[in-house]
Amino acid sequence: MAKKSLIQREKKRQKLEQKYHLIRRSSKKEISKVRSLSDKWEIYGKLQSPPRNSAPTRLHRRCFSTGRPRANYRDFGLSGHILREMVHACLLPGATRSSW
């Protein structure tokens, strides 16, 4: 189980990303429209002004049950070992174990 502080930190990052999403998107559109290099550098400065944790690359997917940030399956929202346990216990409908 992940520490609760790490899970809360991730939630805070998600809120920040949603808050500054429109600002980042509008700045990137402006950069593509502007031709002069000096204006582009000015807009790049604006793009760096939001907090670093508001960048979408800082977000991690976490397992719903354990909060683990690695080996997550997008379809289920679970980490690999929890997914395997749930499939073996027949708790996920439609998921079958592979055998060959």
UniProtKB/Swiss-Prot annotation:
Keywords: Chloroplast, Plastid, Ribonucleoprotein, Ribosomal protein, RNA-binding, rRNA-binding. One of its GO terms (molecular function) is structural constituent of ribosome. The keyword Cell wall biogenesis/degradation does not apply. GO terms for cellular component: chloroplast; ribonucleoprotein complex; ribosome. GO terms for biological process: translation. It is found in: Plastid, Chloroplast. Its main location: plastid. HAMAP family: Ribosomal_uS14_1. Part of the 30S ribosomal subunit. Binds 16S rRNA, required for the assembly of 30S particles. Belongs to the universal ribosomal protein uS14 family. This is Small ribosomal subunit protein uS14c. It comes from Lactuca sativa (Garden lettuce). The gene is rps14.
